[in-house]
Amino acid sequence: MTGTRILELFGPAPEPPSELGRYRILSPTAGIRVSPLQLGALSIGDAWSTDLGSMDKDSAMELLDAYAASGGNFIDTANGYQNEQSETWIGEWMASRTNRDQMVIATKFGPDYRAHELGKGLPVNYSGNHKRSLHMSVRDSLRKLQTSWIDILYLHTWDYTTSIPELMDSLHHLVQRGEVLYLGICNTPAWVVSAANTYAQQQGKTQFSVYQGRWNPLRREIERDILPMARHFGMAVTVYDALGSGKFQSRDMLARRKDQGEGLRAIYGGEQTALEEAMSKALGVVAAQHGTESVTAVALAYLLAKAPYVFPIIGGRKIQHLHDNIQALSLRLSQEEIKYLESVGDFDPGFPYDMAGVDPADTGIATPIVAQAAPMAFVQRSKAIGYAESNKGSQTSG
């Protein structure tokens, strides 16, 4: 029997199979190590095939295998996705591959997840932000995922019907029991998250460590209040709709889809708008500057360059799309490229930012009330890993 040398145990790990396996710390308040792109499991299942396209169980297992083989360990699902098939199939996959300990699983509670079987109106307490809904959802998610813990549990949507103390006390209880490790929240106003995290900090409870919301070069509302809030509380931001509901595609890509009998999803409008077409062209220009044809990789790279602790969710049903999206991790966008992409759309931060200005730590420019007093210089905030100027001379791409 051959032993292992001590120096080998303390030596560095080998290079990953792809940049997906160059892991990152989730957030300043959550030290778990995760892949920089999260696999979205909305399409894992066949119950919603009419709207999202068909994916049988074998294809789902192959997609999960391909993600893991590329170094991916970060999967996003929810209690009701695909009428509960998403969690169930992920659980079966982890059990058959005996890889639960290698995966970081995020799931969600809040919306009614049992109406598909029980009918509308009957499962009233299977939905909501309250303790009973939370209890049943976590009980069922643990069973479907075939696990004893959930790495990240999100509140899927704030519904204004449960008090912040009830919500945060109930979530903290699950953390104390070891059934949930980290807390997240989606689709919720910044003031609610701020109030919830402040309550948690004051009461010695577990705070939210990650926020999930919509963000892409044409939908930048998250930058107004949610992104500064996340930075203040040490939260990561996981991003859905990063590819504009699949509308960020070149003319060639759209033509190939139509030739294959696969157009854009009707649930998302069916066709590109003029603005989506213009953004796709702009993404193509930046892609060409980086020697790639992938507009989706550039759309993801845009988010990875915008702020630290940002993790885009990549969905889809095809392995080739997965590999295409992984290209984003090797791209570094400059400030000029970011501004070029943002020039296509129209984002107005509005009041009070149009009066008070924005944080000089981001811009290096004094706000009006500071500038009137004296010339000032400012320490700049840390940039994202995917921001070009933050990696000059670096040969790593993690």
Swiss-Prot record:
Pathway: Secondary metabolite biosynthesis; terpenoid biosynthesis. Keywords: NADP, Oxidoreductase. GO terms for biological process: terpenoid biosynthetic process. CDD domains: AKR_AKR9A3_9B1-4. The keyword Oxidoreductase applies. In A.calidoustus, the austinoid gene cluster lies on a contiguous DNA region, while clusters from E.nidulans and P.brasilianum are split in their respective genomes. Genetic rearrangements provoked variability among the clusters and E.nidulans produces the least number of austionoid derivatives with the end products austinol and dehydroaustinol, while P.brasilianum can produce until acetoxydehydroaustin, and A.calidoustus produces the highest number of identified derivatives. Aldo-keto reductase; part of the gene cluster B that mediates the biosynthesis of the fungal meroterpenoid acetoxydehydroaustin. The first step of the pathway is the synthesis of 3,5-dimethylorsellinic acid by the polyketide synthase ausA. 3,5-dimethylorsellinic acid is then prenylated by the polyprenyl transferase ausN. Further epoxidation by the FAD-dependent monooxygenase ausM and cyclization by the probable terpene cyclase ausL lead to the formation of protoaustinoid A. This is Aldo-keto reductase ausK. It comes from Penicillium brasilianum.
